[in-house]
Amino acid sequence: MAYTQTATSSALLETVRGNNTLVNDLAKRRLYDTAVDEFNARDRRPKVNFSKVVSEEQTLIATKAYPEFQITFYNTQNAVHSLAGGLRSLELEYLMMQIPYGSLTYDIGGNFASHLFKGRAYVHCCMPNLDVRDIMRHEGQKDSIELYLSRLERGNKHVPNFQKEAFDRYAEMPNEVVCHDTFQTCRHSQECYTGRVYAIALHSIYDIPADEFGAALLRKNVHVCYAAFHFSENLLLEDSHVNLDEINACFQRDGDRLTFSFASESTLNYSHSYSNILKYVCKTYFPASNREVYMKEFLVTRVNTWFCKFSRIDTFLLYKGVAHKGVDSEQFYKAMEDAWHYKKTLAMCNSERILLEDSSSVNYWFPKMRDMVIVPLFDISLETSKRTRKEVLVSKDFVYTVLNHIRTYQAKALTYSNVLSFVESIRSRVIINGVTARSEWDVDKSLLQSLSMTFFLHTKLAVLKDDLLISKFALGPKTVSQHVWDEISLAFGNAFPSIKERLINRKLIKITENALEIRVPDLYVTFHDRLVSEYKMSVDMPVLDIRKKMEETEEMYNALSELSVLKNSDKFDVDVFSQMCQSLEVDPMTAAKVIVAVMSNESGLTLTFEQPTEANVALALQDSEKASDGALVVTSRDVEEPSIKGSMARGELQLAGLSGDVPESSYTRSEEIESLEQFHMATASSLIHKQMCSIVYTGPLKVQQMKNFIDSLVASLSAAVSNLVKILKDTAAIDLETRQKFGVLDVASKRWLVKPSAKNHAWGVVETHARKYHVALLEHDEFGIITCDNWRRVAVSSESVVYSDMAKLRTLRRLLKDGEPHVSSAKVVLVDGVPGCGKTKEILSRVNFEEDLILVPGRQAAEMIRRRANASGIIVATKDNVRTVDSFLMNYGKGARCQFKRLFIDEGLMLHTGCVNFLVEMSLCDIAYVYGDTQQIPYINRVTGFPYPAHFAKLEVDEVETRRTTLRCPADVTHFLNQRYEGHVMCTSSEKKSVSQEMVSGAASINPVSKPLKGKILTFTQSDKEALLSRGYADVHTVHEVQGETYADVSLVRLTPTPVSIIARDSPHVLVSLSRHTKSLKYYTVVMDPLVSIIRDLERVSSYLLDMYKVDAGTQXQLQVDSVFKNFNLFVAAPKTGDISDMQFYYDKCLPGNSTLLNNYDAVTMKLTDISLNVKDCILDMSKSVAAPKDVKPTLIPMVRTAAEMPRQTGLLENLVAMIKRNFNSPELSGVVDIENTASLVVDKFFDSYLLKEKRKPNKNFSLFSRESLNRWIAKQEQVTIGQLADFDFVDLPAVDQYRHMIKAQPKQKLDLSIQTEYPALQTIVYHSKKINAIFGPLFSELTRQLLDSIDSSRFLFFTRKTPAQIEDFFGDLDSHVPMDVLELDVSKYDKSQNEFHCAVEYEIWRRLGLEDFLAEVWKQGHRKTTLKDYTAGIKTCLWYQRKSGDVTTFIGNTVIIASCLASMLPMEKLIKGAFCGDDSLLYFPKGCEYPDIQQAANLMWNFEAKLFKKQYGYFCGRYVIHHDRGCIVYYDPLKLISKLGAKHIKDWDHLEEFRRSLCDVAESLNNCAYYTQLDDAVGEVHKTAPPGSFVYKSLVKYLSDKVLFRSLFLDGSSC
């Protein structure tokens, strides 16, 4: 039995501790199932599409307000009051959710289109035309239906099934769906309906008189009516203007007229009766008859919208259930009838009772008014000295928090500025539970000054009143001004009445015995009201006929039912099927039956593939060598085409490509296009191809590319001809941009109707007098174009200047054999080179002009190559061997030579891949070199709608050669190129920093006078190019036009503020734009874009890093310099420049937002607000909760604004919060650890890693206790400490487990943004008495000295009393040429995480160093279970383990623990250098070392929340360790230095001077500016937003080194 109980207890304990795997698995499974159920429940929510454009804040408002829906925000529709408009649909759906589905529902003033779209066939909408806007709104609803149906029709879709019933009902019986009567007079019939009837009123009850509402509901037999309307509690006050901030709307009241409108919008306003709305708000019962009444019940308020419901109540039910056994029933009923008559009359009278008589009802109906008070604000006129007064609603808690605090101010401190400072501070942030800082009270910022004046006056009067009471001052005769001040004092005394009292006092409402009387001004009629009433007419709204659409929908549904028998019918593309039926004019049912027959193999046709992929279709279209037996095979066939001569006789010319837009799979030409004259007078329609989508190309990839190239020429010619025909038809409506590209000649008048920019066009489109359009080859004389008599007009364009596409088509058609292009067997080599790698230079060095051919894309490039090749005076490059691609294609066969040995194509990747294949074939070469850049701008398909598949863009080559040295680009651009190219890109340029950018205020600021641009001017878009040319700039090109060109200086301009797709980080256009210059590039832009970010990154690249990209940088000279200056820092005195604003700017860039905090009163607000704390077992002396008041001396005020806090006052609350956040918040992460054995192994590793081999064993001849050691310890102590030992007899040991607790009054600044949301905990100090320190201090001092003497100081640095110079010496021999990993271990809550295991490790280290067993045991027990006493704050508690922050082993103990921790996890035998100091560590390992999972090991073994960081530079004890090629320099953290300059605890000027000297000591190295660049990089690693900071480093040196100048950083607080 005992064994069973033991086993049961053990199992229970394991379960509680989480060690039972079965229970853990069950818990995980349960958690998983719960999460799945929760997500499934969320997915089942109704889905609502929010199409209107709203901000992120408005998105959160809608999502939080309506959790019942799954809202999808598309942000695709810009509209007025977009949030309110979008919420209208959510409000409608919320109201409809309250109604049982299918129940007859009346939508009062509703939107019948919304119900049709939702498929609600059971809703009837009463939509009376009470105003012109109502008619407009109703027409808009019908337009939305018509638009919806037209979209379905355009997409060959039909009304979905769930909408079909509703649309059928509207098509057949529109009066059943919507009527235009008021709800009170609605004639809708409820025949054949027996269920309950419901109604909804969405923002429509304003116009229904409240006295008629109940009767109207009863007339329609409505069971429950759900309503929603806008309202604000402030309308019950005297305010004539009330804002609804969430929806950006407002109410304006003028007498009984209440106007609703949206702010900052020109939409029409809505006017209602204020008294009528007030009845809906204040009344509870709405009588319907002498028996039934509708009772209003408030539901919820969401986003300025109130929801309520009106339930039908039968009042006769109040007494029908009364028991009457044992009495005379007749007498009972008679008495009840009399009583009921009286009670019913009283109930009807009480139905008008105001709801505000009950305070709980007020809080229920007006939740925003809860805990709000009315505060008067005062103002005075400077001209008339007239005082004015108004009232505002403010949180009661906020008011009394301010008043109670400022009431404690002394007379001298009670000033308006101090009150305003406190009010502004607590309004911006309040400390919650001593942890979180947040804004607690939402008080309008515009009221803070007036409120502060009110609080100040109130407190002044309260102080005066107290003085009068104390002195028992007797009042005598009073002057008028004294009476006025008495009235003000009286108003202040009654500043906070309840809402009810204020309403009654202002006579807004009047309470009578039986009813609520609302007093409003008499009604009046304005001119606008009179005009509307005179011309008001009532007409019936026309009905929208949708019967035809419903019939088409029915046919489509029947066809889809036929198709449902197919396999995978759920994936059937209904849109394509509907489009096919419409284009072929086929009945959907017939088409469906044919498809089913084909797919069921019942049509006699066998399909050769299942999925119509490109590969399957191409395979199916190939001719089969041998058909399978018994199978029907469909193959392509040759189709005879009419001859060219026959076509010319009819004026037609068929130009379809190899795979054009006709059904045949291939073409064979019986006759070829022999000359360009065959194009003359061909009809334009024969050249225009409306459908540019090719069928599948067949053959190898190169053949497919060549076919696609021919098709692209056809498409380009077709587009050019089509545009010219359109110009001829629309000459009178040509915009300015089109006029620059086209020209139209009137033949009769010989005058250009639209003058072209070019002259002597080669061809054009002619319009004859018969309104026919033909393509004509043009001839010119001295008067212009030679025309014919039957020509009416001639149109030309920039594409018709030359016969480009026509001549290319003629040439390529001659090359086809049986309709198929031939592929060359020549070897194709791709030379992939970076920008400026010398591709043209290499071509000229390799080419043999006698037997090779060079082809380039542009004429300028061809002329440049000829000029460079013939520079020696010998003509070797001619127009026969250096040609443009277009010239070669257009004039093929006309030159003297047709065959070449080698072909060189410059910028070949800018060409169509099919064009490159044709060039290789036409040159008849043995090898072709295609020079290009895979990362620059590729071939761009200029014909919209013409397909150029992605796999066609890749050129098939036999070999790839790379060129990765740029002769053009400066070093910073080369740095960018290394991010885009594989392999190392190098440069030969001596320029390092060449790129810059400038943000311009707008496109208008770019003009030649105010902004002359240097060098070549480039743009990204043609529109920007034209804009610059029109403003007077010369020689402007786009980036695409200058690819391959080189310029010394470039000015890149962007004038387009809208997003441009080609401006992206990985865009080839950006790459080309950055690589055109050799000296400088400046980017002028009107908006921030990725290129600005790239240039800013390049500006920050250090110069020494850019030297790595130079190919001509030798290493021998560097090695010689390195050997001379080894271990010595270059010293360059830092100039003393800068100002205070430099330090402020740098601080704000690194820590944005910290300097704006108003945290001077954080400690005050924590004491003033309620607080809830979770504490461990402790004893609190509550008599210490109220600190004794102290005179606070003013401190110096810093000019540099940082997040530094004011010193805090020690007290119960402050000390307890610090203890909770520090000592009571220790992590528990460790797993199961064998403490003694593991500690022994860790210490073994510690001694093997850090101690010299000969000193790993303790010196037995060494005594820890000696007079010398005690004298050394005493010499380090202060006289006060020694005086405390005077009465110590040293007979017995004091209580070693007793500690004292205190806090540091000055909070430690964190160099992050946590101060914006957190209340930093003070550092706690737990320390022994001096008597214990006198015993163990000398002991551990000797142990520490012995340990440090044994450490391998060449590799390890235990930072104890080391100067920055000693740190520099330690790291000075690091070889910067050896790649290293710089590691930092960051441990959170280091002291409080240490438990029994850490103590065991530390005790084992001390034991091995020679600590005696007895003292070791005493020390161990003194750190096991310890008692903490805080006498100042009145706190006593017990702690287990933890590092005590004030005993004699705090620093060295933390140091050996962090060193032991790292030795147990990292391969210390590979370590190059390592430094340890408290919880800080810095390690240098060789690059590429493998490390274990540090986080897991630190958690499970060491109970540490640890993170391991890899960095370029080390950060150690608040200092940056910068290693370089000459040694090492240690810079104090400049951001930490600036943070200290914002200190708010400096007492006086003497204290400030001591403060300056201490900062000078730690920041001495900043005087050396030689390594500021590396310091910038180091700071940038920690603070990503930090700018280059040499200016601020110099500023710090300037102020720290000058005593007088340093005083200007602070102001005297006593004089402020």
From Swiss-Prot:
Source domain of life: Viruses
Limits of the (+)RNA virus helicase C-terminal domain: 964-1116
Mutation effect (Q979H): Normal tomato Tm-1-mediated resistance (AC A7M6E7) leading to impaired infectivity in resistant tomato plants
UniProt xrefs under CDD domains: Virgaviridae_RdRp (cd23251)
Pfam families: RdRP_2, Viral_helicase1, Vmethyltransf
InterPro entries xrefs: (+)RNA_virus_helicase_core_dom (IPR027351), Alphavirus-like_MT_dom (IPR002588), DNA/RNA_pol_sf (IPR043502), P-loop_NTPase (IPR027417), RNA-dep_RNA_pol_alsuvir (IPR001788), RNA-dir_pol_PSvirus (IPR007094), Virgaviridae_RdRp (IPR047310)
Region of interest (Methyltransferase), residue spans: 50-458
Family from the record: Belongs to the ssRNA positive-strand viruses RNA-directed RNA polymerase family.
Protein name according to UniProt: Replicase large subunit
